[in-house]
């Protein structure tokens, strides 16, 4: 997926679990443009993971074996916590 195709990335952010939508969509909407190109590629790789894995990682019930994905999970958690709740 092209890091500049925001419509397609936005669609990929829509998950099958509301809990994931609450974590991933606000991060994409508020933070994606400020990421480096490498971070955008890692974010897209994270979106390619299965929902149960994403849920577990974002809810701190484990972590990805891949260090880059782990960094992105932590970044999503940190930025979402700093920004606070947002309406989706």
From Swiss-Prot:
UniProt xrefs under SUPFAM superfamilies: YgfY-like
GO BP terms in the entry: respiratory chain complex II assembly; succinate metabolic process
Subcellular location: Cytoplasm
Pfam families per record: Sdh5 (PF03937)
Top-level taxon: Bacteria
GO cellular component: cytoplasm
Effect of a null allele: No aerobic growth on succinate, 80% reduction of succinate dehydrogenase (SDH) activity. Significantly decreased anaerobic growth on glycerol fumarate medium, 70% reduction in fumarate reductase activity. Low covalent attachment of FAD to FrdA or SdhA.
Keywords: Chaperone, Cytoplasm
Function of the protein: An FAD assembly protein, which accelerates covalent attachment of the cofactor into other proteins. Plays an essential role in the assembly of succinate dehydrogenase (SDH, respiratory complex II), an enzyme complex that is a component of both the tricarboxylic acid cycle and the electron transport chain, and which couples the oxidation of succinate to fumarate with the reduction of ubiquinone (coenzyme Q) to ubiquinol. Required for flavinylation (covalent attachment of FAD) of the flavoprotein subunit SdhA of SDH.
Subunit structure: Monomer. Can be cross-linked to FrdA and SdhA.
PANTHER family, per the entry: FAD ASSEMBLY FACTOR SDHE
UniProt similarity note: Belongs to the SdhE FAD assembly factor family.
Protein name: FAD assembly factor SdhE
Source species: Escherichia coli (strain K12)
Gene from which the chain derives: sdhE
């Amino acid at each position: 997926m092209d890091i500049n195709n925001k419509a397609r990335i936005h669609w990929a952010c829509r998950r099958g679990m509301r809990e994931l939508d609450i974590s991933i969509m606000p991060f994409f909407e508020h933070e994606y443009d400020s990421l480096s190109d490498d971070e955008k590629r890692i974010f897209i790789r994270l979106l390619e993971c299965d929902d149960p894995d994403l849920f577990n990682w974002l809810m701190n019930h484990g972590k990805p074996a891949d260090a880059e994905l782990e960094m992105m999970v932590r970044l999503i958690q940190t930025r979402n916590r700093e920004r606070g709740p947002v309406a989706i």
